[in-house]
Amino acid sequence: MGLKADCWIRQKAVEDGMIEPFCEDQIGKGVVSYGLSSYGYDIRVSDEFKIFTNVNAEVVDPKHFDERNVVDFKGDVCIVPPNSFALARTVEYFRIPRNVLAICVGKSTYARCGIIVNVTPFEPEFEGHITIEISNTTPLPAKIYANEGIAQVLFFEGDEDCEVSYKDKRGKYQHQRGITLPKIL
């Protein structure tokens, strides 16, 4: 399984629509960088957020998630409260090839500010926006800049196609648009 370079990522994005919209250059002046890099693609966070709140004093339960646990926010800058958590989504829509697994890692710019980004792997033949988990580990409010970089995606091509892809097993987050809350089937 090999890590894929910029030329492969560009070809798959342009010819097969693997990443839409696709930014062929790495944009970094005055913003948290995003776009194509040497061995990855820096994704952007959209201007849609769901910020966790304890107004209703509910327990967070992944099997029975209560939408009252989050507050919707739309804007150019999202303030994540101290020691709190938010969900967001990518600007980009992904179509992952059958023989590819993508791993996402947080950007150093945010990590150095105590902002931890988590995204689960993009499985073979996954299609959709990516829901991003953002943790503010600091005792201070933290800014997240919409339409700027938030994490980097690394693409790994398998030596052979998998027997069962995310699409084949009808993954519960397949074709997700917007921010998707936890689901149990």
Curated annotation (Swiss-Prot):
HAMAP family given in the database record: dCTP_deaminase (MF_00146)
NCBIfam families in alphabetical order: dCTP_deam (TIGR02274)
Phylogenetic classification of the source organism: Bacteria, Pseudomonadati, Campylobacterota, Epsilonproteobacteria, Nautiliales
Protein name per its UniProtKB record: dCTP deaminase
One Pfam family this sequence matches: DCD
Subunit-structure text: Homotrimer.
Gene3D superfamilies assigned: 2.70.40.10
Family to which the UniProt record says this protein belongs: Belongs to the dCTP deaminase family.
Pathway(s) annotated for this protein in UniProt: Pyrimidine metabolism; dUMP biosynthesis; dUMP from dCTP (dUTP route): step 1/2
Role according to the record: Catalyzes the deamination of dCTP to dUTP.
Record's catalysed reaction(s): dCTP + H2O + H(+) = dUTP + NH4(+)
GO MF entries: dCTP deaminase activity; nucleotide binding
Top class in the EC scheme: hydrolase
Keywords attached to this entry: Hydrolase, Nucleotide metabolism, Nucleotide-binding
EC number from the UniProt entry: 3.5.4.13
Binding site for dCTP: K107, S108, T109, Y110, A111, R112, Q152, Y166, Q176
Listed GO biological process terms: dUMP biosynthetic process; dUTP biosynthetic process; nucleobase-containing small molecule interconversion
Active site residues per record: E133 (proton donor/acceptor)
